[in-house]
A protein has these predicted regions:
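N-terminal Rossmann-fold NAD(P) dinucleotide-binding loop
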Residues: 111
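HTH-adjacent hinge/linker in prokaryotic transcriptional regulators
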Residues: 47, 51, 56-99
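Phosphate-bearing ligand-interacting subdomains
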Residues: 38-41, 145-233
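Glycine-rich Rossmann-fold phosphate-binding loop(s) that bind the pyrophosphate
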Residues: 107-108
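NAD(P)-binding Rossmann-fold cofactor-contacting core
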Residues: 122-143
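Extreme N-terminal segment that seeds HTH/winged-HTH DNA-binding domains in transcriptional regulators
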Residues: 1-46
């Protein structure tokens, strides 16, 4: 099995081997690999072929091999993939093993729902705190996470070296809160505010989540299939 560090590609200015550019499409598939491989481990599986994995992923076996070859391959001819090994390597690629931490800003319905989920811990992200401006919730604990006043956000993030900021605030407040987090050293922002957030500081990665867009895509698919059925009839 090839090491994750032994990736063929170009060399940087210091003579070190550089990882080739990876497409967004491949990056978006990595969490799916991680999820499905985790399920296979839970089922007691030890290895899997690219053909079988392609059926689970609903992509071609060739695409599976191309995706994984971007990071070194990880497979053996005639054996396929060691599931635990591949799961571990993809966990490394996704940062699951980095010990990232997060704060949630906004203790409304969405913020509370995110606080309740086990999603963070299962992906190696520790939720340290929540923040809000409502005096009725400041000082409380929501699913075991203490709520602080947003005025404490900057100092808390700096002191605890917070990696990820989760925004569940009204769109009018999103930019200012994001700037506070960026100045405090937060490396990434998961934005659920109803706006497209862009920061001048390109060292901060922003992932804009629009739940409404996903709902409208579903509505479109339902409508389109309904129209196709009418035509067939």
């Amino acid at each position: 099995m090839e090491s994750i560090d032994k990736i063929q590609g170009t060399f940087d200015a210091k003579g070190k081997e550089a990882r080739p550019a990876v497409s967004d499409a491949v990056i978006k598939r990595l969490p799916r690999y991680h999820r499905y491989l985790g399920e296979l481990i839970a089922d007691g599986r030890l290895r899997i072929s690219s053909a079988e994995l392609s059926q689970i992923m609903n992509v071609t076996a060739s695409q599976i091999r191309q995706d994984l070859n971007c990071f070194g391959g990880f497979g053996q001819q005639g054996y396929g993939y060691n599931i635990k090994y591949l799961y571990g390597k993809i966990s490394e690629l996704l940062g699951v093993t980095q010990g990232y931490s997060a704060v949630i800003v906004g203790a409304g319905n969405l913020g509370r729902a995110l606080a309740a989920t086990h999603m963070f811990g299962r992906r190696g992200v520790e939720r340290l705190a929540m923040f809000d401006i409502d005096p009725k919730v400041v000082g409380e604990e929501i699913y075991g996470i203490k709520v602080y006043h947003v005025d404490e956000l900057y100092e808390f993030c700096r002191r605890n070296e917070v990696t990820i900021g989760v925004l569940t605030v009204p769109k009018e407040a999103a930019y200012n809160v994001a700037m506070i987090m960026a100045h405090a050293g937060v490396k990434g922002i998961w934005n659920f505010a109803n706006m497209e957030l862009e920061l001048e500081d390109r060292s901060v990665t922003v992932e804009n989540i629009h739940l409404g867009d996903s709902l409208m895509k579903l509505c479109y698919e339902i409508k389109t299939r309904g129209e196709e059925k009418e035509i067939e009839e």
